[in-house]
Amino acid sequence: MPTQRRQFTAFSRLLHWTMAAMILTMLCVGVTMVVSLSNYHVLVSIHRPLGIAILILVVIRFGNRLLNRPPPFPATMSRAERLAATASELTLYGLMFVLPLVGWGMLSAARYPIVLYGPVHLPFILPHNAMLYAVLRQMHTVLAYLFFLTFLAHFGAILFHTLIVRDGILKRMVPWTVRPREPAPTE
């Protein structure tokens, strides 16, 4: 019988930490865009391509997740905790997919150019419609807040399990390979 993996695959961990850095950057850029109009254009030029990069990576990540089963949860986690962890993971995946699409749709409805880099522009995916733009703009804001709350719950749960419960759940996703502990010698 094959032994169960203790960690996510190296590729899964690479995707996770790359996207975590991108998402933290996106959250900071998003908040700063709203409160600092003097830097708005520079921040938007970061926000748009970063959102599309996140969209592309979440599709890759979701496919990778379907192909590679995650390691088991620690035995210390109750059924309710496992369900909450799975629900928050699915919520994060969903929001990482939907938020960039809503942003793209919002800009399309307003006919704002979606510049990725230099002359590379994304096509419009929705018709020009001011009302649709207004609805999608509100939706983008609400979903961004929901994403931030879900991210905080995810981060808080990891801190709780790492610092309080000490069940080793973070070892499943750390970037480095974790070797199993050798049993202590008996006398």
Explain the meaning of each model-derived region.
Residues M1-E187:
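Membrane-embedded alpha-helical bundles that constitute the cytochrome b-like, heme-associated redox core
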